[in-house]
């Protein structure tokens, strides 16, 4: 799906474990490329009427709001998505159309909101078209949870990344949810710990295709600063 409209949704679900409603409800104003982090603080309402062009109010997340690091491995995807948004806006306006600037990171080409049910159905069609074994979009979230836990063993931090309660992450991973088993060092999960877990997972996903250092270097830094200033 690299280079298609599905690239970023799959990255957010498969690399970060975001829910579909959180993905299509993520606003560009909650992404800070200069600080290399983004906030999952709202989600798309469950039932968006067909033909909706503007969203004035989002729904709260299912759990506590969370701030997640943008790893070096994930940054190129974020930059490409911002470039895609800019191109779509320019093409829409050049063609005489109206661009609905909802400041959504994942939206239709004219900026209007995606609907959760249509996204799920379209993902199913994509999987069939690619002749891949059947999976639901939500299965990408479970895959992220399982892989992060297997690679790091950090039960509590994985739960914080996913926006799960201890009971929820335990059920998802199929392990004990005895609160007494959670040591005091995990009670306050800081951004640095989330960074460590996510970086371990993301490096394992693409050990030979990481765009860092000399390959991306100063160009990535310049783009990040430029995008950050555009969002302010």
Identify the residue ranges that each predicted region occupies:
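C-terminal catalytic core of tyrosine-transesterase DNA break-rejoin enzymes
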Residues: 11, 15, 21-22, 118-129, ...
